[in-house]
Design a protein with these regions (language model features):
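Structural hallmark of WD40 beta-propellers
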Residues: 9-14, 60-67, 76, 127-133, ...
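Generic preference for well-ordered alpha-helical elements
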Residues: 10, 15, 19, 46-50, ...
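Contiguous hydrophobic segments
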Residues: 10-14, 38-45, 55, 72, ...
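Short coil/turn segments within WD40 beta-propeller repeats
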Residues: 19-23, 72-75, 137-141
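Intrinsically disordered, low-complexity acidic/polar tracts
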Residues: 71, 118-128, 132-136
Length: 149
């Protein structure tokens, strides 16, 4: 479905799949088409297709990581630990729709219907904590890595 080469280590390729799996390949390894890291049901893989993956700047612990977004409504960061791929949920995209006028006089009332399907994201070049998320519903949301959930 999607892929992204690491900007500093171009042999590392992050891949997002239609079944919700994310993987990392080392393309220097000849004749081996197995990933060096792979998400599983036990490691909280996405439950819907992954539409975008993107390497992030390495965190303070110097672990490499990348982000993924899926139709399941989750933006997740994946940390490459020594022997495993460790997920951390960044945000859940809540699907909100305005109430019917007949049900409420207050136009600001809203129902939460579940999770919005995430399609794409991009990081702000000047404020590394900020990023935009595009959803299946055609909405664009300003998000922050500083606040999760």
């Amino acid at each position: 479905m999607c892929l992204d080469f690491h900007p500093k280590f171009p042999a590392l390729l992050a891949v997002g799949c239609y079944d919700g799996t994310v993987m990392v390949f080392d393309i220097r390894i000849k004749g081996n088409n197995k990933p060096i890291y792979q998400s599983t049901v036990r490691t909280a893989k996405h439950t819907d297709p992954v539409w975008q993956v993107r390497w992030s700047s390495d965190d303070a612990t110097k672990n490499m990581s990348f982000y993924s977004i899926s139709s399941d409504g989750r933006v997740t960061t994946w940390n490459l630990m020594k022997n495993k791929l460790e997920p951390e949920e960044v945000i859940k995209l809540k699907l909100v729709a305005e109430q019917d006028k007949e049900l409420s006089d207050n136009k600001k009332d809203a129902f939460v219907y579940g999770l919005a399907g995430g399609m794409c994201f991009d990081f702000n070049k000047f404020h590394d904590q900020l990023f935009l998320v595009g959803t299946e519903e055609g909405k664009i949301h300003l998000c922050s890595r500083a606040y999760s959930g």
